[in-house]
């Protein structure tokens, strides 16, 4: 197969592992930055064209069609990355997470709404408009309070407000800067830990428990967190699969938390990192992703 990976940083561990696995399985793979793409729509055939420019001084060239697309772009590239994914989906080319599912997962509030609609428990959450009083809005959520920007990954854009006064100050400042925030209950009993479930298709292929640094409420690897092996219950596996399916994803990193109220889904990541979970679980996830693409291509 001829594969395309959409990625801004091809040197990242996840991109390198997927490239190695694809080539080891006999496939050709290009790694391109979606922000260096140009999409063209025309009344006359061909109606859809996609060009690529290696650098600002190079001549753009027309990209060929591929057999499958692997999206690995970050939150800052979501708009262009999803436009490129839609281009290929329009041509009936398999995308390992299409643009529709990607956009659902990348919008934190929308994803929480969709999960809740399907009866999937999430932390108590609230979203207020720019003209709604922050002082009144914060009363809907417990204190301490988690504040999250609607778009972001790797723990970036997540703030713990220790009291309501701090929460209001942060909300008013960021609202003034036109940065919308959602509010969530802080799950104190989790003590800075969560469970990452890596889902491919209809299977949870790997898991780990992530542990935040001392005095750090975020358990993300990129925030200096560590990880250890963990055995999921059957209920946790079912929940991870249900959350993935709810957003229409083929591949997902589902973050769960064990709370006093029961299992909660914190987030569903459409482009989950491989490094920490491969090293913790000892499972070759990159290979399993390539094998999943092969199965879809043969259908």
From Swiss-Prot:
The keyword Nucleotide-binding applies. Binds 2 magnesium or manganese ions per subunit. ATP binds at residues 148, 185-186, 194, 218-220. Mg(2+) 2 binds at residues 267, 269. One of its GO terms (molecular function) is metal ion binding. Belongs to the RimK family. Disulfide bonds: none annotated. GO terms for cellular component: cytoplasm. Mn(2+) 2 binds at residues 267, 269. GO terms for biological process: protein modification process; SOS response; translation. The gene is rimK. Mn(2+) 1 binds at residues 255, 267. This is Probable alpha-L-glutamate ligase. It comes from the Bacteria. HAMAP family: RimK (MF_01552).
């Amino acid at each position: 197969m001829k594969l395309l990976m959409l990625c801004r940083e091809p040197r990242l561990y996840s991109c390198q592992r997927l490239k190695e696995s694809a080539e080891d399985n006999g496939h050709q793979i290009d790694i391109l930055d979606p922000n260096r793409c140009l999409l063209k729509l025309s009344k006359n055939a061909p109606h859809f064209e996609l060009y690529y420019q290696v650098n600002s001084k190079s001549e753009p060239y027309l990209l060929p069609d591929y057999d499958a697309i692997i999206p690995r772009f970050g939150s800052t590239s979501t708009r262009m990355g999803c436009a490129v994914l839609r281009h290929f989906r329009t041509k009936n080319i398999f995308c390992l997470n299409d643009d529709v599912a990607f956009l659902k997962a990348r919008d934190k509030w929308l994803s929480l709404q969709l999960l809740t609609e399907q009866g999937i428990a999430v932390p108590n959450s609230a979203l207020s408009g720019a003209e709604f009083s922050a002082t009144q809005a914060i009363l809907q959520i417990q204190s301490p309070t988690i504040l999250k920007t609607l778009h972001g990954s790797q723990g970036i854009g997540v703030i713990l407000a220790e009291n309501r006064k701090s929460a209001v100050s942060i909300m008013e400042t960021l609202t003034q800067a036109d940065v919308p925030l959602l509010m969530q209950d802080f799950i104190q009993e989790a003590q800075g830990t969560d469970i990452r479930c890596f889902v491919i298709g209809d299977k949870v292929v790997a898991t780990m428990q992530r542990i935040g640094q001392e005095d750090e409420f975020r358990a993300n690897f990129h925030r200096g967190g560590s990880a250890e092996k963990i055995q999921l219950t059957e209920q946790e596996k079912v929940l991870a699969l249900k959350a993935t399916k709810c957003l229409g994803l083929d591949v997902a990193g589902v973050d769960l938390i064990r709370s006093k109220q029961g299992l909660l889904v914190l987030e569903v990541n459409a482009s989950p990192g491989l490094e920490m979970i491969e090293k913790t679980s000892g499972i070759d996830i990159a290979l399993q992703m390539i094998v999943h693409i092969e199965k879809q291509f043969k259908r």
